[in-house]
């Protein structure tokens, strides 16, 4: 048997280390990379892969609401911080009026971006704690930031053109557009709401008990291996992630 896990490219290298360690324990895992954030759930729901690893709980909740897919989180992986980045300005204070500001277009990550812009005191939101706020919920925008909405993975490329960009360290590292450590501000989140999840179909453990047991072993390797941890530090950045499984 072979476990097939659908993943986002920025998560590939630490997972590959876990795959090599799992093989030594007789567990065969194949990683399939998806460049967008819709196909991994469609493919999982269809039964073409055993699990996916690319999304956090709010994103999964929203996907289930929109598609009625029968999916659930099996376990948590890494939690990454997010940041505001700029190649043109070296502080939040230096951001000018009408700055072209790039944020993700999906409701969940847009909400996360707006919370960070609020933390940076660039905007304020109707409900300051709502992690699903959208552009209509901005009650003050003193610098008249101009918002440009792009797909989440594309935020890393936008750093070259825009004035200010919300993005993810692991995507920036992959795109090589800017050093992920050079954020003007990072989110101060310490909870695991945004941990990346290992997601399976609702009935996976009942339908495939042997494979599910192997998958759980693989996840344990990912969570506990020193080599995986070293790779996460080099791939994401030591201060830019923390474990979601504690």
Where are these regions (language model features)?
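A conserved helix-loop-strand patch within extracytoplasmic ligand-binding domains
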Residues: 74-124, 229
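Short beta-strand->loop
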Residues: 5-9, 99-107, 186, 201
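A bilobed periplasmic-binding-protein/Venus flytrap-type ligand-binding module shared by bacterial periplasmic
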Residues: 81-92, 195-212
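Beta->alpha turn/N-cap motifs
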Residues: 33-37, 47, 51-61, 151-152, ...
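Short, polar/charged alpha-helical segment
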Residues: 5-30
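Ligand-binding clefts/hinges and TM-proximal coupling segments of bilobed small-molecule sensing domains
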Residues: 107-133, 219-246
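Short helix-initiation/N-cap motifs at beta->coil->alpha
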Residues: 31-42, 129-157
């Amino acid at each position: 048997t072979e476990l097939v896990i659908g993943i986002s490219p920025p998560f590939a290298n630490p997972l590959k280390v876990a795959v090599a360690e799992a093989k030594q324990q007789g567990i065969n895992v194949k990683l399939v990379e998806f460049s967008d954030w819709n196909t991994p759930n469609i493919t999982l729901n269809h039964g073409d892969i055993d699990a996916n690893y690319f999304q956090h709980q709010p994103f999964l909740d929203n996907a289930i609401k929109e598609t009625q897919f029968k999916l659930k989180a099996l376990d948590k992986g890494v939690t990454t911080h997010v940041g505001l980045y700029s190649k043109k300005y070296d502080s939040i204070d230096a951001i000018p009026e009408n700055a072209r500001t790039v944020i993700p277009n999906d409701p969940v990550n847009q909400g996360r971006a707006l919370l960070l812009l609020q933390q940076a005191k660039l905007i304020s939101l109707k409900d300051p704690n709502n992690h699903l706020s959208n552009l209509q919920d901005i009650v003050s925008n003193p610098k008249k930031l101009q918002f440009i909405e792009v797909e989440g993975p594309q935020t890393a490329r936008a750093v070259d053109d825009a004035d200010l960009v919300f993005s993810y360290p692991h995507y920036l590292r992959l795109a090589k557009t800017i050093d992920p450590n050079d954020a003007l501000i990072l989110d101060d989140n310490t909870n695991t709401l945004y941990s990346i999840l290992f997601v399976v179909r609702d009935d996976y453990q009942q339908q495939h008990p042997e494979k599910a047991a192997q998958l759980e072993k693989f996840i344990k390797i990912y969570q506990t291996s020193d080599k995986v941890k070293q790779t996460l530090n080099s791939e994401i950045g030591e201060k830019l992630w923390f474990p979601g499984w504690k």
